[in-house]
Each structure stands twice: as structure tokens, then as C-alpha cells.
Regions:
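Secondary-structure transition/capping motifs at alpha-helix termini
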Residues: 227-236, 258-266, 318-319, 342-352, ...
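His/Asp/Glu-enriched, well-ordered alpha-helical/loop segment
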Residues: 181, 314-324, 328-354, 358-359, ...
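Short, small/polar residue-rich loop motifs at catalytic or cofactor-binding pockets
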Residues: 20-21, 268-269, 473, 504-506
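An anion/phosphate-binding loop that grips the pyrophosphate of nucleotide cofactors and donors
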Residues: 41, 373, 486
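Non-cysteine beta-strand/loop elements that form the S-adenosyl-L-methionine
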Residues: 265-285, 375-385
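A structural microfeature
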Residues: 10, 509-510, 519
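Short, solvent-exposed loop/turn segments at the edges of secondary structure
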Residues: 48-51, 232, 270, 351, ...
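Divalent metal-binding segments
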Residues: 2-4, 8-254, 275-315, 319-328, ...
Length: 523
């Protein structure tokens, strides 16, 4: 590969490239494998900064400093880790944990009694792995003004009518977030958080990554522009403006997005807008069609009211923005497809590439409709491993769980698609994500929907050029072609030569960004 000015000048033999003139030969990767820099089409910058809080997830997980945090298999273990962290906090600080998910604990739900036992005086907040639910203790409920008379959808209650401390979706969580300052978002755009994210991305071979909910705050924008412009910052960032932040005011969001676009440079690309229609399947807040949740749980929560979605989609579509729309359940997917269809009928637009994010329960008919409308999908392949067994037994049941995150069906329907980690929901690692799509093995080893497996080549396309396409960046990244950024992932082995089962274990040896080789940073 010949590189000039950070871009790919040519690809071929030394003889075929000789016409470009003299060159300095860099053969440091002579015994490695170069592939296009990996593209994470759905993640969030807090994947780095979240580690300033206490990890209380079920699965083992490695932090940016290299420490392996053991997964917690009981409520008692969660409480013990929280108590250990609480003992080191300043007296007036809020204790914040993240990564918890009650679905792994045989039907038991966390409530105020569990967290009051951690601290009866200090406010305690535990964000679920999905980021769509949280648990808080009695002091936090009191400070947030949430009591038995609070009338907000998503405030769950105990048998005596008092709040249980479990808050489902953004309206219910807002009184708490308002007090603690939305730390799960702001840590992502702090300088330390950005640098930690860059380190994690580089370990994973990622050279382009999204921040798929960005509030466009002035301080965060300034930090993003400054840090990403540093020559050795190892990843290109593609943020999406959070429509939710602007409370149904598209004009205000679009004005702020236009300000952000003025900061764009080679490693910062504003222009997308994120809408969130429903919640989390494993949190039972996603909106699903008949026959509903397998365990009989009531249907989920509309984060955007159906009566409002058309107006929002139309406004952003008419403004020329590309929409990335969170739909987990198939009822939410149907609503989003219909909203995009109506927007296109009113205002036809070529090559819009509006993308449904997660899109986990879409069926073949919905994928065919998406293809006819020029829509894309970004499927949450990692869910198969982390929550596949729970979906099989509790949320969707065998039939529907076997067709979740249906990459093969999307491909047959002609829908351009990518696959993702949604980090920090699951760890950033596109080779693992590709492994999930190619193998569809759950954490117990069950194959969940063998007919929805895709080949390794298709899975790798989904985390390179496929993801770039969904971001409108396929002219710049995603493949090793003349004119594109000279971004590469350096591997120890050829991912197309190892068995599909070994794809997740191919070591990343380094990355190249704009022609600059970057050694893996220690940590």
C-alpha cells in the first residue's frame, strides 16, 4: 500500500506503484496482516470514561487500564463491591455503579432495600447494563422527589405502593439524572474519557467509531474538537446529535448540529441525528408485537410517543440529516419504518440511508420494506452471546429468539447492514462482534438460529465497509482503496484463514491512522 498525505495513493506490487516516484519502505508489518481499519457503527464515547464508576456487571470485563474485573454472580457480590467503593468516597459524593442486569438473577429484582443496605445515608445509583433502567436507594429517591404520589411512567412500585427504586426509561430516570448531572454522558466527552476511549478502540483495532448519543454541549464539543485533532489520537469519531436532549424541538437541535458541523475535520464527523423509539428487550421496556413477551411481562415503553414520531422524522429528514433510529422491538421497528415511508412520500430523497439501530426483532417482511425504502440496519450481534439464553427462556421464547439480529435475512432482503457492540453496553471489539454474527453462540454455548449465521467474509464486511456505508463514510473509510484514509487494523493472523470459531481470538497487533503507525498503548 502506497500512502501520501494520510491517504491511500495506490495498492499493488512495488513495481506497479513505482510510477509514483521514490518511496520510503516501511516493512514493520511484514509478518502481520493488514485489513481495513475496523469501523464500530454503534458505540458511545463513555466506553472509556464509565470506568470512573463502579463496574457491577454479570460478565468479566477488562477496563482501559488493563485490569480484569470479575463478573458478579449474586446480589450479595454486587452489594459487596459497592460497599467497598463506598468506603473510599468523600462524604457528600454519590455512589454510582454500572453494568448491572437483574435478568441473570432468576427473576429477582433489585429494590431500595438492597441499596439501602449498601448505604442508608449516601445516595446510591446503579445503572443497568442496557442504560435504559437504573436502581436507586431511599436517599436518592428522596432527593429526586420520587414518592408514592409520583405519576411518571416507568417508576416501579412495591406491593405497598412505595417506589421500589427501579426506574425504567428516560422520563423516570430524569429526576435523578438532573441531580447528578448526566454523568454517564459527560464522562465520554471529558478529556480523560476521550483518551481512555481512544486506548480501548485501538486495542480493538477500531479506527472509526460513533458516539451515537451526543448532547452537543459547548464544553464537550470543544474538547472533542481539540483532542481528536491531535496527530496521534487513534480513532475518527462520528457523533450523532441526541434528539431526546432537545425535548422534541428539531429546530433547536438542528441549529446546534450546524454549529457542531463547523468543527468537523478529518477525525471528527458531525451530521447524524439519533432518535430513540423504545427501550430494552431484556429490560422489558422494548415495544414488541403480538404475542408479546414470552414470560407474560407487559409491553414496554414508548420513549417517543407514536403520535410524535412522524413529526420528528419529517423535520430531520427535510433538513437533510441522516437519522439513526433506535428500535429494539418489532412494534417499534414497524412504527419507524412507517414514519420513514411517510417522510419519503412527502419529501422524496435519494441516498438518505436512514438506519434502524439494533432492529433486533425485525422479520423478513420488515427487512423487505426497509430495502424498498433505501433504509439500512445495524444489528446488535453481541446480544446473541450476552443475552441469547435469556431471550430464549424469558423474553422472546425459542422461535423468536432464533431469528433475533437476523443478519442472513437482512442480506437476503438486500438491506445494507452493519453489526455492533453498543459499547459500553457490551465491550468494544468488532472481531468479537463478527464472531457473534458468524457463529451465533450464546454464553452457554447454544447456537441460537443457525440459519441466521453469516460467513466470516460477510461479518468482516459488516464491521468495515458495511458500517462505513451506514455512516455515509464509505467514500473515506472501510476498505483499502485509492483516495481513502490510510487507516488499517494490524492483525497477527489472517481472519479469513482461521476457522469461524476462532475469529474472536485473532490478536490485534496495532493500528494505522492516516498513514501513522500506532503501537498498542500499554494499560
Amino acid at each position: 500500500v502506497a500512502v501520501r498525505d494520510g491517504r491511500i495513493l495506490g495498492v499493488g506490487s512495488k513495481e506497479s506503484l513505482a510510477g509514483w516516484g521514490s518511496a520510503e519502505v516501511d516493512d514493520r508489518y511484514a509478518d502481520k496482516v493488514l485489513m481495513p481499519g475496523l469501523v464500530e457503527g454503534h458505540c458511545h464515547l463513555p466506553e472509556g470514561g464509565m470506568w470512573k464508576f463502579v463496574y457491577v456487571g454479570f460478565y468479566d470485563r477488562r477496563g482501559p487500564d488493563g485490569r480484569l474485573w470479575e463478573g458478579l454472580k449474586s446480589f450479595e457480590a454486587v452489594a459487596a463491591r459497592l460497599r467497598e467503593a463506598e468506603s473510599a468516597l468523600a462524604p457528600d459524593a454519590t455512589l454510582i455503579g454500572w453494568g448491572f442486569d437483574p435478568i441473570f438473577f432468576e427473576g429477582r429484582r433489585m429494590d431500595v432495600r438492597d441499596l439501602d443496605a449498601v448505604s442508608p445515608r449516601r445516595p446510591v445509583v446503579v445503572m443497568h447494563a442496557s442504560m435504559h433502567l437504573m436502581n436507586v436507594n431511599t436517599p436518592m429517591l428522596a432527593r429526586a422527589g420520587i414518592d408514592r404520589d409520583t405519576d411518571i411512567e416507568g417508576v416501579t412500585r412495591m406491593e405497598n405502593g412505595e417506589p421500589s427504586g427501579e426506574l425504567c426509561e428516560f422520563a423516570a430516570m430524569f429526576p435523578v439524572m438532573r441531580l447528578i448531572g448526566s454523568p454517564f454522558r459527560t464522562v465520554g466527552v471529558s478529556e480523560d474519557g476521550l483518551r481512555m476511549f481512544g486506548k480501548v478502540a485501538q486495542w480493538a483495532g477500531v479506527t472509526t467509531a460513533t458516539d451515537l448519543v451526543n448532547e452537543l454541549g459547548d464544553e464537550g464539543l470543544a474538547t472533542l474538537a481539540r483532542v481528536t485533532a491531535e496527530p496521534d489520537y487513534p480513532v475518527r469519531i462520528v457523533p450523532a446529535a441526541s434528539a431526546l436532549t432537545y425535548a422534541g424541538d428539531p429546530a433547536r437541535c438542528l441549529a446546534k448540529l450546524e454549529e457542531a458541523r463547523r468543527l468537523n475535520h478529518g477525525k471528527l464527523h458531525f451530521g447524524m441525528v439519533k432518535l430513540v423509539v423504545d427501550g430494552s428487550i431484556q429490560g422489558f421496556t422494548a415495544r414488541v408485537r403480538w404475542p408479546g413477551y414470552y414470560n407474560g411481562a407487559p409491553n414496554g415503553i414508548w420513549v417517543i410517543a407514536p403520535s410524535e414520531l412522524d413529526t420528528l422524522v419529517q423535520a430531520y429528514h427535510d433538513a437533510g440529516a441522516q437519522l439513526h433510529i433506535h428500535t429494539n422491538g418489532d412494534e417499534a421497528t414497524q412504527l419507524a419504518i412507517e414514519a420513514v415511508d411517510r417522510a419519503l412520500r412527502r419529501s422524496p430523497r435519494r441516498d438518505h440511508r436512514h438506519t434502524l439501530q439494533h432492529c433486533q426483532m425485525a422479520d423478513a417482511a420488515q427487512f423487505r420494506r426497509m430495502a424498498s425504502l433505501g433504509m439500512c440496519a445495524n444489528l446488535f450481534a453481541n446480544h446473541i452471546f450476552y443475552w441469547g439464553d435469556a431471550h430464549y427462556a424469558l423474553t422472546m421464547g425459542p422461535d423468536r429468539a432464533n431469528r433475533m439480529d437476523a443478519c442472513a435475512t437482512a442480506a437476503r432482503a438486500g438491506v445494507p447492514f452493519s453489526i455492533h457492540s453498543d459499547a459500553p453496553i457490551t465491550p468494544l471489539g468488532p472481531l468479537f462482534t463478527a464472531w457473534c454474527a458468524a457463529n451465533r453462540r450464546t454464553s452457554s454455548g447454544r447456537v441460537l438460529g443457525e440459519s441466521e449465521r453469516i460467513g466470516v467474509d460477510a461479518a468482516l464486511h459488516a464491521v468495515t465497509l458495511g458500517a462505513a456505508y451506514t455512516l455515509h463514510l464509505d467514500h473515506l473509510v472501510g476498505s483499502i482503496e485509492v483516495g481513502k484514509y490510510a487507516d488499517f487494523c494490524v492483525l497477527e493472523d489472517d481472519p479469513l484463514a482461521v476457522p469461524a470459531e476462532g475469529l474472536k481470538d485473532v490478536p490485534v497487533a496495532g493500528t494505522v491512522i492516516g498513514g501513522r503507525p500506532l503501537a498498542l498503548r500499554e494499560g
